[in-house]
Amino acid sequence: MPWIQLKLNTTGANAEDLSDALMEAGAVSITFQDTHDTPVFEPLPGETRLWGDTDVIGLFDAETDMNDVVAILENHPLLGAGFAHKIEQLEDKDWEREWMDNFHPMRFGERLWICPSWRDVPDENAVNVMLDPGLAFGTGTHPTTSLCLQWLDSLDLTDKTVIDFGCGSGILAIAALKLGAAKAIGIDIDPQAIQASRDNAERNGVSDRLELYLPKDQPEEMKADVVVANILAGPLRELAPLISVLPVSGGLLGLSGILASQAESVCEAYADSFALDPVVEKEEWCRITGRKN
């Protein structure tokens, strides 16, 4: 049967309240969607973790009078009269198949492909990482992920050790291993990210070469030939003293999760320890790379 979709944009903090409001207004289901395609892992029991900028989408029966729905929502203290929203009529489709059909193998650099598990790899001789959207990296189109994957693809990682600082799903560590690294180390503050990385590594046959740690458990004397950190500008600046000691002398550093407008301040935090390359930009995001002095 056809459906009607109503979409609201809000903050992660307000998403639950607006979800309840949509349900009270007659929605049969609610979906939270990141406005900017940033990955979020399964929450811990009793915890709902959402993005800072979240779309709350309510699905309504096709017979619903949406004028009545809007009138109800206008009384909500977070919305008010004339609140911004988008209403769409959805066709009757096989939604699971429709969702899967939206995702295709993606190429990063010259050798590397990221492929959903239900798709055939486009090149058997390429470096293929099998990761599904959602658990792995949202839709996989976020510029910071792309920038990091392209950088790793450009390197000769043969027999190298790579640290993925803030590993999330493990996509960067796994890609490094598939690109020839002898060992990768993933570090993340989120136990759910550690589990996601472990599962993805097993799926790609590299779990025997991937070490995973929460910060409290990581070895004190830990070094790598290549360190990549795709987190955010604030933590990259604050953690610069810790991250800067991870590469060996002459080792490489790659940083992303940084808006282009934040590049200068992040560069300043690392300039004393690294010979930095020109900043590479993609859309509004950027990547900073350099070699350890």
UniProtKB/Swiss-Prot annotation:
Keyword 4Fe-4S: no
Catalytic activity: L-lysyl-[protein] + 3 S-adenosyl-L-methionine = N(6),N(6),N(6)-trimethyl-L-lysyl-[protein] + 3 S-adenosyl-L-homocysteine + 3 H(+)
GO biological process, one term: methylation
Cross-referenced CDD domains: AdoMet_MTases
Binding site for S-adenosyl-L-methionine: T145, G166, D188, N230
SUPFAM superfamilies in the record: S-adenosyl-L-methionine-dependent methyltransferases
Keywords: Cytoplasm, Methyltransferase, S-adenosyl-L-methionine, Transferase
InterPro entries, per database record: Ribosomal_L11_MeTrfase_PrmA (IPR050078), Ribosomal_PrmA_MeTrfase (IPR004498), SAM-dependent_MTases_sf (IPR029063)
GO cellular component terms given for this protein: cytosol
Location(s), subcellular: Cytoplasm
GO MF term set: protein-lysine N-methyltransferase activity
Record-listed E.C. numbers: 2.1.1.-
Main localization of the protein described in the UniProt heading: cytoplasm
Gene3D superfamilies according to UniProt: Vaccinia Virus protein VP39
Residue pairs linked by disulfide bridges in the UniProt entry: none
Function, as annotated: Methylates ribosomal protein L11.
Family: Belongs to the methyltransferase superfamily. PrmA family.
HAMAP family: Methyltr_PrmA
Descriptive protein name: Ribosomal protein L11 methyltransferase
Annotated organism of origin: Escherichia coli O8 (strain IAI1)
